[in-house]
From Swiss-Prot:
NCBIfam families registered for this protein in UniProt: reco
Classification of source organism: Bacteria, Pseudomonadati, Pseudomonadota, Betaproteobacteria, Neisseriales
Gene3D superfamilies: Nucleic acid-binding proteins (2.40.50.140), Recombination protein O, C-terminal domain (1.20.1440.120)
One Pfam family of this chain: RecO_N
Biased composition (Polar residues): 252-263
Ranges where the record places region Disordered: 243-263
Species name: Neisseria meningitidis serogroup B (strain ATCC BAA-335 / MC58)
Keywords: DNA damage, DNA recombination, DNA repair
Protein name per UniProt: DNA repair protein RecO
A biological-process GO annotation: DNA recombination
Amino acid sequence: MSEYRVNHEPVFMLASSPWRESSLWVEAFSRRYGRVALLARSARKRQSELRGVLVPFVPVSVSWYGSQELKTLHRAEWVGGWRQPQGRALFGGLYVNELVLKLTAREDPVPELYDALAEVMEAVCCKAAYIDDLRRFEWRLLNLLGVAPDLNRDGDGGTIAAGGTYLVRPETAVFPVGKGFAVPPHAAGVVAPGQSLIDLREGSFRTAESLQQALKITRLFIRHLLPEGLKSRQVLEQIRQFDRKETARETVPTSDGTASNAV
């Protein structure tokens, strides 16, 4: 295969790791070429122009060459965008990057996924409330991967009804069930109201219940695809557990027998 060059391609940096003495191995998701592996030579040197450019969560314009799976990056430019995520939002960005990194194949172009990635990254970095955006992104990703069930019609051919109740499972259609139906122990599935499925399909979460059901459904499918779990989610859960322990430790009884926070 002859060597080819790509110039000024918009990408998002998904992950990077040291390569030999001073270089970086970068995994990036591009709009026209999908996920690509890039070797950024000398990028870890102090004088490298790439040090402040190869950052996650914001769009970057890059140029590369090479015919092998690992391309050589020879130029990168920050194209403007938004600030880096702060606080807990950082884990939202890491979570999105890990999903794309683990669920996409190299050099499989999906322009719609790049657009979805740009939208959710802007939301995570710029909005105080971005949970809706995460659920929308997860569902779009599952649809683009071809693993999301049809939420227009159920497995019997009927239209999803707002007042109905449905069983959602991986690798099969959505089926109507009675309101008292429960998923058997150790079985993978979510019982959800029809309105919640409609809201998930439309990406418009009208109630807290719809948003909670969306979380259950997207988590069900992601666990099915990635049974080993996600590091970003595990780290965030550890932080939450630490916060709960600290809150419990700092809560002391007052003289009237009630509890108050000591700090």
